[in-house]
Amino acid sequence: MKAVIQRVSRASVMVGGDTVGEIGPGLAVLLGVAEGDTQADAEYLVSKIINLRIFADGEGKFNLSLKDLCRELLVVSQFTLIADTRKGRRPSFVEAAQPEEADRLYNLFIRLCRGEGVQAATGKFGAMMMLEIHNDGPVTIILDSRDRLNPRQ
């Protein structure tokens, strides 16, 4: 499971011209589910994202997390994060989870966030969406749940 997280001053997602999710200050999360991902991958990313200290304290240092500040999340599914571009010029998506499993894990991710007391707005799984993201910083971080299996030495 991969996530691109962006610290935002605000963000929204539209489907068919209608706003389906919006937040104020917090994090926009683009979430891609890969074949073989499990609940453990979702749990790892939820814990990492909501506790990642990427908000400035009074001295301007990254010492505060989304959870510390009671900020919001906007979670949008994005299977293209699982693209394999190693061969040729057309991305392959064969490593992305099947839609039913991806939808299940995407919704689990959202439930886990909400279970931690985090306000989480969402896009619509499988829909064509328009995102408006006001990146704050900018701060953009890429997380991969498989990294938990290979910690730094």
From Swiss-Prot:
It is an enzyme of class 3 (hydrolase). This is D-aminoacyl-tRNA deacylase. Homodimer. Belongs to the DTD family. A Gly-cisPro motif from one monomer fits into the active site of the other monomer to allow specific chiral rejection of L-amino acids. GO terms for molecular function: D-tyrosyl-tRNA(Tyr) deacylase activity; Gly-tRNA(Ala) deacylase activity; Ser(Gly)-tRNA(Ala) hydrolase activity; tRNA binding. Gene3D superfamilies: D-tyrosyl-tRNA(Tyr) deacylase. A motif (Gly-cisPro motif, important for rejection of L-amino acids) lies at residues 137-138. It is found in: Cytoplasm. The keyword RNA-binding applies. One of its GO terms (cellular component) is cytoplasm. InterPro entries: Daa-tRNA_deacyls_DTD, DTD-like_sf. It comes from the Bacteria. An aminoacyl-tRNA editing enzyme that deacylates mischarged D-aminoacyl-tRNAs. Also deacylates mischarged glycyl-tRNA(Ala), protecting cells against glycine mischarging by AlaRS. Acts via tRNA-based rather than protein-based catalysis; rejects L-amino acids rather than detecting D-amino acids in the active site. By recycling D-aminoacyl-tRNA to D-amino acids and free tRNA molecules, this enzyme counteracts the toxicity associated with the formation of D-aminoacyl-tRNA entities in vivo and helps enforce protein L-homochirality. It catalyses: glycyl-tRNA(Ala) + H2O = tRNA(Ala) + glycine + H(+); a D-aminoacyl-tRNA + H2O = a tRNA + a D-alpha-amino acid + H(+). PANTHER family: D-AMINOACYL-TRNA DEACYLASE 1 (PTHR10472:SF5), D-TYROSYL-TRNA TYR DEACYLASE (PTHR10472). Keywords: Cytoplasm, Hydrolase, RNA-binding, tRNA-binding. GO terms for biological process: D-amino acid catabolic process. Its EC number is 3.1.1.96.
